[in-house]
A protein has these predicted regions:
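Conserved functional loop/turn residues at catalytic and ligand-binding sites
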Residues: 12, 72-73, 80, 92, ...
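Hinge/capping helix and adjacent helix->loop/strand transition within the periplasmic-binding protein
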Residues: 1-64, 111-114, 127-160
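An extracytoplasmic/periplasmic, membrane-proximal ligand-sensing/linker region
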Residues: 51, 89, 138-199
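Short helices/loops that flank or line small-molecule/ion binding pockets
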Residues: 44, 48, 63-77, 82-90, ...
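Short beta-strand and adjacent tight-turn residues that come in two discontinuous sequence segments
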Residues: 58, 78-79, 98, 124
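C-terminal lobe and pocket-closing loops
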Residues: 84-152, 185
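Alpha-to-beta junction loops
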Residues: 23-27, 51, 70-79, 92-95, ...
């Protein structure tokens, strides 16, 4: 999710784009460190939108980056919805767009997706999975997978996650492996394109 500092004279995604284009190299953006998901998501957005902002990494800490955004030390931050939601709801930061190309966030119905805002290429999501050691017997893996998918499909569980900005999807082990490979290749290509190096 793209969130902006309230110190900027913008209220919408389009206004942010126009302001950033009118001030090339004068704005900056926060991340939780070089190569982190917020950094890669921001670089993808800036590349697609053809914007020039300076990266300010806060080593491994979204909390530091959010504080800098609230203070006006940085102009924008690409952050997970669940992290940003309380600060948006409290009026500390401004939500401009959601990185999902699928749907808006239930708790923020007025915030467009990047696709709706005209940049469908900005498709970057944080995700979580449950894994077991590779030596785990197949029958145990199948049992765990079935039980977890049952929980994930429960409407009450789905609703509890949606309120917090999450979307839960079940899968098979093979589907998860294929998804992880695709995500790895996407991130690898972005890292190589940007010539990122982790210190």
């Amino acid at each position: 999710m793209l969130v902006a500092s309230l110190t900027l004279p913008v209220k919408t995604f389009a206004e942010f784009i126009a302001y950033a284009k009118a001030n090339p190299g004068k704005l900056n953006f926060a991340s939780a460190g070089v190569g982190t998901a917020p950094h890669l998501a921001a670089e993808l957005f800036l590349s697609v939108a053809q914007l020039n902002l300076t990266h300010v990494p806060y080593n491994g800490s979204s909390a530091q980056a959010i504080r800098a955004l609230i203070a006006g030390d940085v102009a924008m931050f690409m952050v997970g919805t669940s992290t940003a939601l309380p600060f948006i709801k409290n009026g500390n930061v401004r939500a401009l767009a959601v990185t999902s190309t699928i749907s808006r966030v239930d708790g923020l119905p007025d915030v467009p997706t990047f696709a709706e805002a005209g940049l469908p290429q900005v498709d970057y999501s944080l995700w979580f999975a449950i894994a077991v050691p590779s030596a785990t017997p197949t029958d145990i893996v199948k049992k765990l997978n079935a039980d977890i998918n049952k929980i994930v499909a429960d409407p009450q569980y789905q609703d509890a996650l949606k309120i917090r900005g999450f979307e839960a999807k079940g899968s098979t082990s093979d589907e998860l492996a294929a998804f992880m490979e695709k995500d790895y290749l996407k991130n690898r290509a972005l890292i190589l394109k940007l010539r990122l190096h982790v210190d």
